[in-house]
């Protein structure tokens, strides 16, 4: 089976998950044919990832949340203004994602919490499964409760998370705690 990874590259967790999954897929005889990484203008894809992924990487601009002055939470107004100015760049990114999915011959799309991948898959319906992976999909689980002092409003997190998985065939919610799968919501807890 041929696989394309689309990864939200702002943190290091999704990149590390992609490295681990790639090794598992290779062990089972599958091939990761392309890796797309979304990032903001200020981020650099870490060298450890570039050295270890062993598959062609293409980087694209992707929305992100800007921190507050004290760097303890994100600044909603600043983030909205900043990302609104970059909409033309994000439209180019959607085109890049679409083109790569269409041309790489993948049998499946693995989306590591990349919002523009969710939008692209919802708009264009490629006829192949999109599987979304990340601990954030646990936010959509009816039994999950947000910690008391979380820096981002729960409704905003859930809204953003839903956009990342629009058009998804499955959502794999990574968790260290036991939760039942939620077939109604398409969530499998792993």
What are the functions of these language-model segments?
Residues 1-4:
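Extreme N-terminal starter segment of soluble prokaryotic enzymes
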Residues 9, 27-88:
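Conserved nucleotide-sugar phosphate-binding/catalytic loop shared by glycosyltransferases and other
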Residues 124, 128-189:
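Active-site-proximal region of nucleotide-activated glycan assembly enzymes
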Residues 7-19:
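A short, glycine/small-residue-rich beta-strand->loop->alpha-helix junction that serves as a flexible
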Residues 22, 26, 122:
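Gly/Ala-rich phosphate-binding loop of Rossmann-like dinucleotide-binding domains
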Residues 73-108, 115-116:
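Conserved nucleotide-sugar donor-binding subdomain of glycosyltransferases
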Residues 37-43, 113-116, 174-180:
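Short, polar loop motifs at secondary-structure junctions
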Residues 43-44, 109-125:
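An aromatic- and histidine-rich active-site surface loop
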